[in-house]
Amino acid sequence: MEGNGSIDMFSEVLENQFLQAAKLVENHLDSEIQKLDQIGEDELELLKEKRLAALRKAQQQKQEWLSKGHGEYREIGSERDFFQEVKESEKVVCHFYRDTTFRCKILDRHLAILAKKHLETKFLKPNVEKAPFLCERLRIKVIPTLALLRDGKTQDYIVGFTDLGNTDDFTTETLEWRLGCSDVINYSGNLMEPPFQSQKKFGTNFTKLEKKTIRGKKYDSDSDDD
């Protein structure tokens, strides 16, 4: 009997706590509803105007990006074009590629998708065989390499597929996450939770991306043999 009494008492405590929590939620909702009821027509009109202004600004920004070539993944024809393209856009992802390198085609597929999704960023692809000066200046040694630029300056590099899980089968979401780590796109996910299906599969911990200085180092590209 004593055991049953303890259970009944425990159940009663839980029930009271649940009722108290429900009451708090109810009071909060009542308070929010009351606030809405107290908003006058002038205030509602002001909120509406602010919302419309924000929408107009966003649309204008979108049109500006599109006019500068954002929203599509494009090849640039010359080294001079590169400097002009980078100068006019705040965020740029630049894929240094070679036609004969298989992994470049893998990146092409993912970058074409991300270019349409992230209008805030310009996505370009110069052919390394047509841009020797540019490759020398940026010290591009591995093909493929993504140069990530902000305000005309190189902020980071993605060299080969090491940061993408060391696999050719990485997802578009994985590349998107990696670009987000360098703040070259507006990433809405959690940077501390990379979208790998299995981190152990790659034998590397990517939960915290370490900053690497790539400029000035020499690399060999096994992908050039493809």
From Swiss-Prot:
Q: Which biological process, per GO, is one annotated for this protein?
A: microtubule cytoskeleton organization
Name the GO cellular-component terms. Answer: centrosome; cytoplasm; midbody; nucleus
Superkingdom of origin: Eukaryota
Q: Which UniProt keywords apply?
A: Cytoplasm, Cytoskeleton, Nucleus, Phosphoprotein
Domain (Thioredoxin) spans 75-180
The modified positions for Phosphoserine read: S188, S221, S223
Location in or out of the cell:
Cytoplasm; Nucleus; Cytoplasm, Cytoskeleton, Microtubule organizing center, Centrosome; Midbody
Provide the assembly information.
Forms ternary complexes with the chaperonin TCP1 complex, spanning the cylindrical chaperonin cavity and contacting at least 2 subunits.
User: What's the protein here called?
Assistant: Thioredoxin domain-containing protein 9
The lineage is: Eukaryota, Metazoa, Chordata, Craniata, Vertebrata
Instruction: Name the encoding gene, please.
Output: Txndc9
